[in-house]
Swiss-Prot record:
It comes from Hydrogenovibrio crunogenus (strain DSM 25203 / XCL-2). It is found in: Cytoplasm. The keyword Ribonucleoprotein does not apply. This is UvrABC system protein C. The keyword RNA-binding does not apply.
Length: 613
């Protein structure tokens, strides 16, 4: 980074010696903050364009007026520049760039094809298991809907391996015809079961027409052999598949994998909607609401930013339909094709089929934007009401709330949840494992959590919240006041939310450093609703974090005490049996069935849990 810009930046000299090769440029303001990151096929031409005499866009003029220095990184190709640009935008989140929310991972459907009787399941995260992954889907709901629909047609099991390995009779899923019961011998043959698995895979690959054709042949064959009950079963499957097909706008064989990206704008707000079609099947949709950095809205520029940020580490379809013209369409196609190692095209909707898809995506985007604007108005009203109730100088747009959770004083965890403009910012949540206090001392736990949180905030110069919410009464509030005095941050607005009579919702009392008598709001007050929402979210996160810590202690500590049992063996035991209780109850012969467990180790584990070690 430039050295605090102690010397005057000479733009003319900089541009004179700037290369004409592709690369990325970073613009800094006078304080040394990166305010914009851009890419260019020709760095000299692109960067020079910012410093011409007049600009049509106010955004560009405002940006240029704040530039104190520029750095460039030269790349071999424009595609490399695009990847680097995206990485830097995600890392630095510059004020004038278009920023889309970074989903940590998208969900997939997983088929455990390596098993004798494969299962079908929801999957999110690293792809370490052996099998087939289908996706990504835009959200968890789309996965669950697909799994539910498939289960009705092809009764492939959706249970975990530990449950499957320990069934002695079929579960409820078998009774309601959602599973063919491969866990119990004699209910379904391996060949019959794998036929359903292959049909499921073919459907997920977008080959539903092939599946229908195959089922049609089997129906005819069963009918010819007078197996009318079996023929009726195939007929019902065909009908169910056709019903699914009828719900999709693309329903012809050989359809390309296609994503449809549409943009809607209103009141200087934007919604980008993506609809994912795979093999003719609609896998779902997702709406995104980018931060556009106070700039004027350029639909093509926003969609380009979406494409670069969305597909940087996701599977790329063969075709992307867009609602607006993209200036950098050619370079985006080149980059996407290089990533996919196959031709990728970006198009406007021309054919009737594509126009139908785009119309649906635009409707989705417009609907999502209206809902977002309505929700924002409601949230802004609640934040303003809270400002009035607590007599704050400005709206509490950045709020942080703390809560404590433990079981009889053990595995104590403090939570800190963050709300921005009345909405949870889950990526900013923090938890604190509390150590070195008297078990059950909530005051000491709160003191430690607040000290750790704001010591770091102060040390690193991070933004301070507009309001800190404490779950508790005057005692907890006074502990917080002591911490902030010690940290010399005693001007921060604080409020504690104490449970009212009978601990009933709506009867809470609010305490602030300047109002020790308490503020008693009506149960339907929207400011109280917001505080209760924040407090309940802190409570939920504290309990979830505490349970995780407690479970980890209970599950792993005893296994760690067994001589000769290392981390890999512990993992194999828990994966195979599904939990510590099942490991405890297992016989020596059952323990030996776990891969890598010898007779000697199995006996050692058994003896440990049965009091002989």
């Amino acid at each position: 980074m430039p050295n605090q810009f102690e010397t005057q930046f000479d733009i003319d000299a900089f541009l004179k010696h700037l290369t004409e090769r592709p690369g990325v440029y970073l613009m800094y303001d006078a304080s040394g903050q990166i305010i914009y990151v851009g890419k260019a096929k020709n760095l000299k031409r692109r960067v020079s364009s910012y410093f011409k005499k007049r600009h049509e866009e106010i955004k560009t003029e405002t940006l240029v007026s704040q530039v104190a220095s520029i750095e460039v990184t030269v790349t071999d190709t424009e595609s490399e520049a695009l990847i680097l640009e995206n990485t830097l935008i995600k890392r630095h989140k510059p004020r004038y760039n278009i920023l889309f929310r970074d989903d940590k991972s998208y969900p997939y459907i997983f088929v455990s094809t390596g098993k004798k009787f494969p299962s079908l399941s929801y999957h999110r995260g690293a792809k370490r298991k052996v099998g087939r992954y289908f996706g990504p889907f835009p959200n968890a709901s789309a996965v669950h809907q697909t799994l539910h629909a498939l289960q009705k047609i092809f009764p492939v099991r959706q249970c975990t391996e530990s449950v499957f390995n320990h069934r002695s009779r079929p579960c409820l899923q078998y009774q309601i015809k959602r599973c063919s019961g491969p866990c119990v011998e004699g209910l379904v043959t391996e060949a019959e079961y794998n036929e359903d698995v292959q049909h499921t895979i073919a459907f997920l690959e977008g080959k539903s027409f092939d599946v229908i054709e195959s089922l049609g042949h089997k129906m005819q064959q069963a009918s010819d052999e007078f197996e009318f009950e079996k023929a009726a079963l195939y007929r019902d499957k065909i009908s169910a598949l056709r019903a699914i097909q009828s719900q999709h706008l693309i329903n012809q064989p050989g359809s390309k994998d296609t994503d449809v990206v549409a943009l809607a704008e209103e009141a200087n707000q934007v919604c980008v909607s993506i609809m994912m079609y795979r093999g003719g099947n609609l896998w779902g949709s997702q709406n995104y609401f980018p931060k556009i950095g106070g700039q004027s809205i350029n639909p093509g520029e926003i969609i380009s930013a979406f494409i670069t940020q969305h597909y940087i580490d996701l599977p790329i379809p063969q075709m992307i339909l867009v609602s607006d013209v993209l200036e950098d369409k050619s370079s985006l196609e080149t980059w996407l094709s290089e990533q996919k190692k196959a031709k990728v095209s970006i198009r406007k909707a021309v054919s009737q089929t594509h126009k139908g898809l785009m119309k649906l995506a635009l409707t989705n985007a417009q609907s999502g934007l209206k809902q977002q604007l309505t929700q924002k108005a409601s949230q802004a009203e609640r934040v303003k009401s809270l400002q009035d109730v607590l007599a704050l100088a400005s709206p509490p747009n950045h709020m942080e709330c703390f809560d404590i959770s433990h079981t009889q004083g053990n595995q104590t965890v403090a939570s800190c949840v963050v709300f921005n403009e009345g909405v949870p910012n889950t990526s900013a949540y923090r938890k604190f494992n509390i150590e070195g206090i008297q078990p059950g001392d909530d005051y000491a736990a709160m003191h430690q959590a607040i000290t750790r949180r704001y010591s770091r905030v102060k040390k690193e110069g991070l933004p301070l919240p507009d309001l800190i919410v404490i779950d508790g009464g005057k005692g907890q509030l006074n502990k917080a006041i002591d911490v902030f005095k010690t940290l010399e941050l005693d001007n921060l607005p604080l409020v504690s939310v104490a449970k009212g009579e009978g601990r009933k919702a709506g009867l809470e009392i609010l305490y602030t450093p300047f109002n020790e008598e308490g503020i008693d709001l009506e149960a339907d007050d929207i400011a109280l609703h917001l505080l209760n929402y924040i407090r309940d979210e802190a409570h939920r996160f504290a309990i979830t974090s505490h349970r995780s810590r407690r479970q980890k202690a209970q599950t792993h500590s005893r296994l760690e005490d067994i001589p000769g049992v290392g981390a890999k063996t512990r993992h194999k035991l828990l994966t195979h049996f599904g939990g510590l209780t099942e490991v405890k109850n297992a016989a020596v012969s059952e323990l030996q069935k776990v891969p890598g467990i010898s007779a000697r180790i199995a006996q050692t584990i058994y003896d440990f849990f049965h009091g002989e070690i």
